[in-house]
Amino acid sequence: MRVLILAENEFEDLELFYPLYRLREEGLEVKVASSSLEVRVGKKGYQVRPDLTYEDVKVEDYAGLVIPGGKSPERVRINERAVEIVKDFLELGKPVAAICHGPQLLISAMAVKGRRMTSWIGIRDDLIAAGALYEDRPVVVDGNVITSRMPDDLPYFCGELIKILKRY
């Protein structure tokens, strides 16, 4: 089973690497996609080399999607293909896990209206304005969408994602 992570520069380091390694511990294959194959650098300086570009992503090859936070989602969401990938995962009912600023991509995918969600407090108003039902909790699961607020919530975030993937 494969999981895809979307990332650009200034991702929140822990929010990319914690799920990447935690999912690998569960025996899942995890790939990182970006707008190019150039090394991406997190806010704290950790680096990741993307495995593929957004253009090369075939959603049917993946069981789930992870969207780390930091400033990366601001960059990912302006890429039309990346937003299309998010929409495709949602339309196929596949798990989509977004943490911190990650839900910005769900806003761009027009996928938050009426959905229970959480996020970093700095984008709470954006989610509410887009129609989300905001909850200030470590993790919120609404159907196939998992959201969390910050790095401290990663154990809950990954735990819920793994539970859902095991049912998939």
Curated annotation (Swiss-Prot):
Naturally occurring in which organism (per UniProt): Archaeoglobus fulgidus (strain ATCC 49558 / DSM 4304 / JCM 9628 / NBRC 100126 / VC-16)
InterPro entries named in the record: C56_PfpI-like, Class_I_gatase-like, DJ-1/PfpI
Name this protein carries in UniProt: Uncharacterized protein AF_1281
Q: What family name appears in the similarity comment?
A: Belongs to the peptidase C56 family.
Record-annotated PfpI endopeptidase domain positions: 1-166
Q: Which domain of life is it from?
A: Archaea
SUPFAM superfamilies per the UniProt record, alphabetical: Class I glutamine amidotransferase-like
Q: Which PANTHER family does the annotation name?
A: DJ-1 PROTEIN, DJ-1_THIJ_PFPI FAMILY PROTEIN
What is an example of a Pfam family matching this protein?
A: DJ-1_PfpI
Extract the Gene3D superfamilies matched here: 3.40.50.880
